[in-house]
Regions:
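The alpha/beta-hydrolase serine catalytic core
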Residues: 114, 126-188
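Conserved alpha/beta-hydrolase
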Residues: 45, 49-72
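Alpha/beta-hydrolase fold nucleophile elbow
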Residues: 98-109
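Gly/Ala-rich beta-loop-alpha elbow adjacent to hydrolase catalytic centers
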Residues: 108-112, 116
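Alpha/beta-hydrolase active-site loop
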Residues: 77-98
Length: 188
């Protein structure tokens, strides 16, 4: 299986780095999406991709903008809205490729999980299977995962700063606008 890296532009003109693994005897197509602050080569994202590759599915992985991968943007500006738009833009680009086929599979971790679920709600005819893994399901429920003081401090300072678990030594600084955007979404 050949691995190819391409750079496409999203609707905002930002570069999105995409990894293509096209199966020689393609039985289907899968888009695999990372979570907040993730990237396309994270070990668990590679495991998701391998499950499809082992079954002769071509796999498209990409770094959303505003993450720690190779695509444009800054992590502090990350939102569900921008991750979702990047997913739509990657799929729209893929529609013009010779290996594209519908319906396709979608797999996503955490924030990627809510994005693929939102896509499936909007375009159910395009989706054969959906695999949201440890998915965000509701902005409102997200606020219940930590105590009120945590979010009060975040809102007051405008940022949440913490060390990355996927890239040790890297500090993640995320704007409060991430929460404001997250509250717009609810799969329940």
């Amino acid at each position: 299986m050949k691995l190819e890296k391409v750079i496409i532009k999203n609707r905002k003109g930002q570069g999105i780095v995409v990894l293509l693994e096209i199966a020689p005897d393609q039985k289907g197509l899968a888009f695999v999406m990372h979570g907040l602050g993730g990237y396309k080569e994270q070990p668990h994202v590679e495991v998701f991709a391998k499950a499809f590759l082992d079954n002769n599915y071509s796999v498209i992985r990409f770094d959303t903008t505003n993450t720690f991968g190779e695509s444009d943007g800054n992590y502090e500006d990350a939102t569900i809205s921008n991750y979702y738009e990047d997913l739509e833009d990657v799929i729209e680009w893929a529609k013009n490729q010779e290996w594209y086929q519908e319906p396709f599979c979608l797999a996503g971790h955490s924030l990627g999980g809510i994005c693929i679920s939102l896509y499936a709600q909007k375009y159910p005819e395009n989706v054969k299977a959906l695999a949201p893994i440890s998915s965000v399901v509701s902005g409102k429920l997200s606020l219940e995962t930590k105590d009120k003081e945590h979010f009060d401090e975040w809102k007051k300072t405008g940022y949440r700063i913490k060390e990355s678990s996927s890239k040790p030594g890297l500090m993640k600084k995320l704007k409060w606008s991430h929460i404001s955007d997250r509250l717009k979404y609810d799969l329940i």
